[in-house]
Amino acid sequence: VTTTNLYRGTTLSGLFLILLATQAIGQGVRIPTAFEQTAISNEKNLIAAKKKDDGAFFKRTLAEDFSLVGIDGQLVQGEEAAGSLGDPDLAELAPYDMKVVALGDNGAVVTYDAVVREAPQEDQGPPPRYQHFSSVWVKLDGQWKLKFHQATATHWGDW
């Protein structure tokens, strides 16, 4: 093996690895569309409002027929649902892996996983630490409204 052949083989191998890495990186990054960015922004605003129990945000953002399925699996609607959305004891709600499914131009389903940390209540333990959330957003009269929200435990007992 000559030095030239060794150099040529090393160079070709290096170029091949760079090409593979470039393609892998390019395929893994997907820029969200403007529609998806709007839906994700709406959901992040909801998360911030949940942490602060921001009644003004809920009043302005929830659809009139808003309904909620809580971590206990119970369906609540109307004022009861709006009152169940905020949680001032929520120490952490860290979303990850957000996905958006468009429902035409005027609707979206936003789903994501989240790490949840909350102070335990006296009569019960803390909620499941890992949860999956789903929200249905609809555009009514030019404004995005939250029509439905659901929390589902993904791991019980992981504190």
Report residues per predicted region.
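A beta-strand edge to alpha-helix "cap/lid" segment located at domain peripheries
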Residues: 27-159
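Bacterial N-terminal signal peptides that target proteins for export
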Residues: 2-14
